[in-house]
Design a protein with these regions (language model features):
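Electropositive, intrinsically flexible nucleic-acid-contacting patches
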Residues: 1-268
Length: 268
């Protein structure tokens, strides 16, 4: 199977997923890019676009109108062209898919479906988020504990990581792990879709999941009242487990990027 690589802008992808119609328009434009190296469709009648991209009439008309509205595509005479959807300052990641083929009658046939393109983009947005989170955690640990991957750092190395830390964005709160609520917020998706995607990323080996349990002081005999108080203190995120006679709280799962599998996804 011949594969093709296409770079996407993480910033533009996140922005597009904030509304359903914009996301549909964005994916439509990416499918046009995936259908040919020139990112264009000649003689773009609705029937022709439907045949190339393998989408229905209603979705095709709606996505085309929205793509024109958000300036993801434009007309150049008798040609429909997908605009450049990334800038030099953007954080970019590549997606890989099966190369488009040409039928016997000379027409193009895009070999990546609308749903598959949506999945590929969403996965790279989350992998990029986890990668940045891992980098921040490693940098802070190197500065505060003076070690990296169990090895003691030299004074010069700590200074390098301290300079890196100072270049990172600073917030009042530090969140360890990645909750489903955060994934839902980034991609504006349902809890079911977020959970399914994270499970598939872990199952494929692209992400490694570590479950983190926090020990609580909740007395099992007085669980109800103390549990409500505890949940109120932590912002109602997580759920309780009974482990070895103690009440534990599992909040966000910690994900680690599997560099062995994801190396090809990082822009050079």
């Amino acid at each position: 199977m011949a594969t093709r690589k296409l770079y996407i802008s993480i910033e533009e992808s996140i922005s597009a997923f904030q509304s359903k119609e914009k996301a549909e328009a964005y994916i439509f434009a990416m499918l046009i890019k995936a259908s040919s190296l020139s990112s264009r469709i000649n003689n773009p009648a609705i029937r022709s676009i439907k045949s190339i991209l393998h989408i229905g009439n209603t979705k095709c008309c709606r996505a085309l109108n929205n793509a024109l509205k958000y300036e993801y595509v434009r007309y150049e005479g008798q040609t429909l062209v997908a605009n450049i959807l990334k800038e030099n300052k953007d954080n970019v990641r590549p997606i890989f898919f099966e190369r488009a083929t040409r039928n016997q009658n000379g027409t193009l046939s895009c070999n990546v479906s609308f749903r598959e393109m949506e999945k590929l983009i969403r996965e790279q947005v989350i992998i990029n988020h986890v990668k940045k989170q891992n980098l921040c955690e490693k940098t802070y640990k190197a500065v505060t504990e003076g070690e990296m991957n169990g090895e003691k750092l030299t004074v010069a190395q700590v200074k390098v990581y301290r300079r890196r830390k100072n270049r990172l964005s600073h917030t009042k709160e530090f969140h360890k792990g990645l909750s489903l609520a955060k994934v839902m917020g980034i991609l504006q998706t349902s809890r079911y879709t977020a959970r399914k995607m994270m499970r598939e990323l872990v199952y494929s080996g692209k992400l490694i999941k570590n479950e983190v349990l926090d020990e609580t002081s909740i007395d099992p005999k007085n669980f109800g009242r103390q549990a409500r108080r505890y949940m109120k203190e932590i912002g109602y995120g997580g759920y309780f487990l009974f482990v070895n006679g103690k009440i534990m709280c599992q909040r966000s799962n910690v994900y680690i990027c599997n560099d062995n599998l994801n190396a090809k996804y990082y822009a050079k």
